[in-house]
């Protein structure tokens, strides 16, 4: 069994390296390599560049804007973005909501939300990851303040404290 990469796979690797050298800012790469905190703008800058290239949704099918890559291509891509010092791709919309919508969403939902995830217009978060609880749903605590005809509930969400969509 030959475990070497094929010439096409090596060419693909080189294409990724070349693209990263031109599209991953040194500022962001330096922050990643120095383990400095990245803000939303840093993630968004890189993810929008990947989206423009068509490389953001590596696990999505082509018909929904994904790459259609093989598992080997996905591996090569992940390996090269790590080597280059790229930020991780923020996964909630891409890896959690998107696949659920593709499987169970109606056409209107797919048409509206999937492109917004790919364009970084919408950022999704795991709504049950709270301070002091993590993903332990039984330990979640909040309060509801009565405002007459509605209540205000205070919740914190990991990686999206400044984001909301009503």
Question: What are the roles of these predicted feature ranges?
Answer:
Residues 120-128:
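A short, Trp-centered hydrophobic/proline-enriched beta-strand micro-motif
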Residues 44-47, 51-111, 115-121:
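Internal helix-loop-helix
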Residues 27-50:
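Short secondary-structure junction/hinge motifs that connect adjacent elements
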Residues 1-5:
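Intrinsic disorder at enzyme termini
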Residues 132-140:
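Active-site-adjacent elements of ketosynthase-type condensing enzymes
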Residues 156-163:
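Conserved small/polar residues in nucleotide/adenosyl-binding loops
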């Amino acid at each position: 069994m030959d475990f070497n990469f094929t010439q096409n796979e090596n060419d693909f690797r080189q294409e990724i390296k070349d693209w990263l050298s031109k599209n991953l800012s040194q500022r962001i790469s330096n922050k990643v390599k120095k383990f400095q905190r990245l803000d939303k703008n840093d993630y968004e800058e890189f993810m929008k560049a990947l989206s423009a290239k068509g490389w953001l949704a590596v696990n999505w099918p082509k018909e929904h804007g994904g790459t259609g890559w093989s598992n080997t291509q996905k591996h090569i891509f992940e390996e090269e973005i790590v080597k280059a010092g790229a930020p991780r791709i923020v996964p909630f919309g891409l890896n959690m909501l998107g696949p659920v919508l593709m499987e169970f969403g109606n056409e209107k939902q797919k048409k509206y939300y999937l492109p917004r995830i790919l364009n970084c217009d919408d950022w999704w978060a795991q709504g049950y990851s709270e301070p002091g609880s993590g993903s332990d749903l039984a330990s979640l605590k909040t309060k509801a303040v009565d405002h007459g005809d509605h209540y205000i509930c205070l919740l914190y969400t990991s990686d999206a404290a400044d984001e909301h969509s009503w």
